[in-house]
Design a protein with these regions (language model features):
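Helical "lid/coupling" subdomains associated with nucleotide-phosphate turnover
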Residues: 1-158
């Protein structure tokens, strides 16, 4: 993502620059698909962990500040993801910096991350994206604990 942002720029990303980022990533994803095959009939969902997808979820939820407990486990349908990416693309660099879910640390990188996600979404169309702010193993453990009734999800239990 950093390399993509450095190569194309991350401050003033036009729709044309964004399309070029997607095309660059799509070439890599397409070679993966050619070697390993697709994912069938589209009755799948994507799982995104940390970084761009958590930023997208935070913006989607219109959080005043990033809240891990609200973002972690969030489901987004394809149209919601698309709308947030379109919003981010329409924002200036300063607008991205001002958003508490993005900030100065990520404002120049978030659109490169969105381009990567868009290339993946085009190669593997699906209706839903699940957002994980925690690692996959931690998320699976939390889910099992919830199913067993030992995790309240309010942050007060491990």
């Amino acid at each position: 993502m950093v390399t993509l942002a450095e190569r194309h720029g991350g401050h003033q990303v036009t729709p044309e620059i964004y399309a070029a980022m997607i095309a660059e990533v799509a070439a890599l994803v397409d070679s993966f698909v050619a070697e390993h095959g697709g994912l069938g009939d589209g009755h799948i969902h994507l799982l995104g962990t940390s970084g761009t997808v958590t930023t997208i979820a935070g913006v989607h939820l219109e959080l005043r500040r990033y809240e891990r407990r609200r973002v972690d486990g969030c489901w987004m349908v394809d149209d919601q993801v698309t709308r947030v990416i379109e919003r981010l693309l329409a924002w200036s660099y300063e607008d991205r910096v001002a958003n508490a879910c993005i900030g100065a640390e990520r404002a120049d990188l978030v659109l490169a991350g969105c381009a990567i996600l868009d290339a993946i979404r085009r190669a593997f169309p699906c209706q839903r994206l699940r957002v994980a702010d925690r690692g996959l193993r931690e998320g699976m453990l939390v889910q099992m604990m919830r199913e067993d009734g030992v995790w309240g999800g309010d942050g007060s239990t491990p």
